[in-house]
Amino acid sequence: LTTGRAELDGAGNLQNYRVEQGKVSIEGKGLDGKRADSVSILARTIDVNAGVWANKLNTRTGQNNIDAKNLKATALDLSSTEIKPTIGLDVAAVGGMYANHITMVGTEAGVGVNLNGVVAGTQSVSVDANGHLSVNGTLQSDTSLVAKANSIQNTKTIASGGDLGLETKELTNTGHITSAKNGHIKVEETLTNNNTMAAGANTQGALTGNGSLSIEAGTVRNTDAVIVSGGATTINSKEVHNTENGRIYGGKVAIQTKVLENRKNVALESKLDAAMADMKAVEDKLEAAYAVDTTAFTSKTEQDEYLNRIK
């Protein structure tokens, strides 16, 4: 399925699909392509409001030249006064994509992928977005899952039954990010974890194996949350802030950082600091009020003048 224009080579063979505009929407009873070797949806934007089933499922969004043989998408350099879409691939809560292999590519700068439904692959799942990836549903593979985007926000489930790889500039997790085997997470700037990140674990973060978790980030903020693996947990970051009952566990734990903040209750510490400051102020006032006067006088006249001043 494509909104693009077929382009032929000199011999009349199909060479590319040129996609400049257009939307493909999956509605109603959905699309069952399991009898075909593969299903490919090529458009500037794609809306999935029903189920899509396939052996191999490919989506390509953005303004692209798409190779007809291998589906490699090369972004077109088009100047346009049209308003750019904010979402390239939108899987609604009532929609879903199910296949052995799923590959999602969005090339348009700043245009995101929104997954509110279920995207599930029995073999491999791959996401490559030149914008924001938002997971408010389930992004899952039984074997291998790789996701790359400018920024990633997960509120529900990102899970791999095998290895997991995430690469982004900013990662915010308030849900569960898990892998049954090894997990590698690379974040150029800030990784914020407020729930569970686990390797060697099931989708709820309970340890089931000895998979290792490797994290590379500019800054790691683990707040009232868990980073854990059944094997080695390795963090390489300029700053690591493990606060508010944050926990970092593993069979082995190695943290390489310039700044390590490991504090159980920052809010309580702030209150205690304020209380101590108040106590110090009271102490200073009491000391001033009851201090022994050691003023020295050289004459009776100086003494009388001083006593008159302090009356």
Annotate each predicted stretch with a short phrase.
Residues L1-G230, T234-S237, H241-K258, R263-D284:
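Extracellular and secretory-pathway beta-repeat/beta-biased strand scaffolds
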Residues K271-K311:
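Extended amphipathic alpha-helical heptad-repeat regions
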